[in-house]
Amino acid sequence: MLGEKSDFTIHPINVLQDNIVWVWVHNCNAVVVDPSISGPVEKWLLEKNLSLKAILQTHHHDDHIGGTQKLIKTWPEAKVVASKKEHKRIPFQTFSVDDNDIFNLMDAEIKVIEVHGHTDNHIAFYISKQNAKCNILFPGDTLFGGGCGRLLEGSPVQMFESLYKLNSLPENTEIYPAHEYTESNLKWALSLEPGNISIIERLKLIQKKLQKGMSSLPSTLSEERKTNLFLIAENVEKFTMLRKHKDRWKC
């Protein structure tokens, strides 16, 4: 949530195997991030009597854009915000953005951050509001709880640089990734650093949450700096080694 007294709230809709569609609500309006499928999202919005104002697309993969076209049939005035470099792969975008663009939506300022690595032209959305207790990051598949996205199109150098960009944000930034991978990521990290108290404590905490049917997310940048081995890798060589190890690792 953006600030203790804010009327902004963010809600998870769990879909498919491990995707999370985040819904950002302000008064009677909503913004949806990376809708994998339309059904559960449309149902949730209609039950809450919310008007869909925009859809934020971080990248072109079907488990992130699969529900968009059906949602804009129900709410034709909703903007579809996506990278202007992805017109071919996200052809239904109606509000095209580029790296470092800033636009306003639902009484907040949103900055676009280009984060190559998982895919070319992947973007993240950084949301700030004056006098808010914290700011918010929707990183798509770039940054996860305790992890980062696989390198499907980009290089280790690109992902390392993208994580460096995100790591430069304020430490109280709340992070809303598009997948629930935190437990697996922390188990992997613990296999490399079995004595890391921060990872041990975080893993215990999120396992309790998951057992209660809760989400492990959002996390904070402060928390990721203590427990995310990818984010704190000292150099590209270390990052590359970690990414290759994680790609081969079995939980």
UniProtKB/Swiss-Prot annotation:
Coiled coil: none annotated. Thiolesterase that catalyzes the hydrolysis of S-D-lactoyl-glutathione to form glutathione and D-lactic acid. Binds 2 Zn(2+) ions per subunit. This is Hydroxyacylglutathione hydrolase. Transmembrane segments: none annotated. It catalyses: an S-(2-hydroxyacyl)glutathione + H2O = a 2-hydroxy carboxylate + glutathione + H(+). Zn(2+) 1 binds at residues 59, 61, 118, 141. Belongs to the metallo-beta-lactamase superfamily. Glyoxalase II family. PANTHER family: HYDROXYACYLGLUTATHIONE HYDROLASE (PTHR43705), HYDROXYACYLGLUTATHIONE HYDROLASE GLOB (PTHR43705:SF1). Zn(2+) 2 binds at residues 63-64, 141, 179. It comes from the Bacteria. Keywords: Hydrolase, Metal-binding, Zinc. One of its GO terms (molecular function) is hydroxyacylglutathione hydrolase activity. The keyword Metal-binding applies. Its EC number is 3.1.2.6. Pathway: Secondary metabolite metabolism; methylglyoxal degradation; (R)-lactate from methylglyoxal: step 2/2.
